[in-house]
């Protein structure tokens, strides 16, 4: 069992079947699953994506300035983070949102030592606004924050896949799922686990990653308890 984890949630996971925005039923289910692992005395930090609201890369592809599009994505992660905080606190889980871009009226600024102190007090810390810099994904944010707070693992909860495959299982019936794989293989084979910056950061800092489906309730707890689930990525 892990003692301190970073949970990476894709923005799309929050949209549920509607595909856009925030599905209250889904976010309440995720909040309950997070509560389950906090009750095991596990320290939990969360990084949320923004794909349910906005994608910087998509805006850039349509002619928008890339940096501007990325900043819009960072703001969208704050909306998702506040929604998750609200769902957590509604069921009695104390939490804090920390943002990489200061907006003191709605959240704390990101301060590493303060984040660690919150975790030690068993508060869930939600890291929002990415790294605060354009051109960096929320996957990279998860890797960076995991290294900074010395998390033991990153739990990557996906909404459309249950692990890492050698091909896209949605289009290739013969795609095979890996139980374990190395970061070097992920980078060498160009597997779509996380972007190369995030993968390299995890590899260099020896942070294992568990990729699994968020759609099956209880999977977060299973991953934390070390049950065989999804795909584990580690080492070189």
UniProtKB/Swiss-Prot annotation:
UniProt pathway: Pyrimidine metabolism; CTP biosynthesis via de novo pathway; UDP from UMP (UMPK route): step 1/1
EC number(s) stated in the UniProt entry for this protein: 2.7.4.22
GO cellular component: cytoplasm
Reactions performed catalytically: UMP + ATP = UDP + ADP
Regulation: Allosterically activated by GTP. Inhibited by UTP.
Biological process terms in GO annotation: 'de novo' CTP biosynthetic process; UDP biosynthetic process
Family matches, as Pfam families: AA_kinase
Gene3D superfamilies named among the record's database cross-references: Acetylglutamate kinase-like
Main location: cytoplasm
Molecular-function GO terms, alphabetical: ATP binding; UMP kinase activity
Binding site for UMP: 70, 131-138
Superkingdom field: Bacteria
Keywords: Allosteric enzyme, ATP-binding, Cytoplasm, Kinase, Nucleotide-binding, Pyrimidine biosynthesis, Transferase
Cell compartments where the protein resides: Cytoplasm
Top EC group: transferase
Residues annotated as binding ATP: 8-11, 51, 55, 159, 165, 168
Membrane-spanning segments: none
Residue numbers spanned by region Involved in allosteric activation by GTP: 16-21
Function field: Catalyzes the reversible phosphorylation of UMP to UDP.
Family: Belongs to the UMP kinase family.
UniProt subunit comment: Homohexamer.
HAMAP family assigned to the protein according to its UniProt record, in alphabetical order: PyrH_B (MF_01220_B)
Protein name according to UniProt: Uridylate kinase
Organism: Shouchella clausii (strain KSM-K16) (Alkalihalobacillus clausii)
């Amino acid at each position: 069992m892990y003692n301190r984890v970073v949970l990476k949630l894709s923005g799309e996971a929050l949209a549920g079947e509607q595909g856009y925005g925030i599905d209250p039923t889904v976010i309440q289910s995720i909040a309950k699953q997070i509560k389950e692992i906090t009750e095991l005395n596990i320290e939990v930090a969360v990084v949320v994506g923004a794909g349910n609201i906005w994608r910087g890369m998509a805006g850039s592809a349509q002619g928008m300035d890339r940096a501007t599009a990325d900043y819009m994505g960072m703001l969208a992660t704050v909306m998702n983070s506040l929604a998750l905080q609200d769902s957590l606190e509604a069921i009695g889980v104390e939490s804090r949102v920390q943002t990489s871009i200061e907006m003191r009226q709605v959240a704390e600024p990101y301060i590493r030592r303060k984040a660690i102190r919150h975790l030690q007090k068993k508060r869930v810390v939600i890291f929002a606004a990415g790294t605060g810099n354009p051109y960096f994904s929320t996957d990279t944010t998860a890797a960076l924050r995991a290294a900074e707070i010395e998390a033991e693992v990153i739990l990557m909860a996906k909404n459309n896949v249950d692990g890492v495959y050698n091909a896209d299982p949605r289009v290739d019936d013969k795609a095979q799922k890996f139980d374990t794989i190395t970061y070097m293989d992920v980078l060498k084979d160009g597997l779509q686990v996380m972007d190369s910056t995030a993968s390299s950061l995890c590899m260099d800092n020896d942070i294992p990653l568990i990729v699994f489906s968020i759609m099956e309730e209880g999977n977060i707890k299973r991953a934390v308890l070390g049950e065989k689930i999804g795909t584990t990525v580690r080492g070189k």
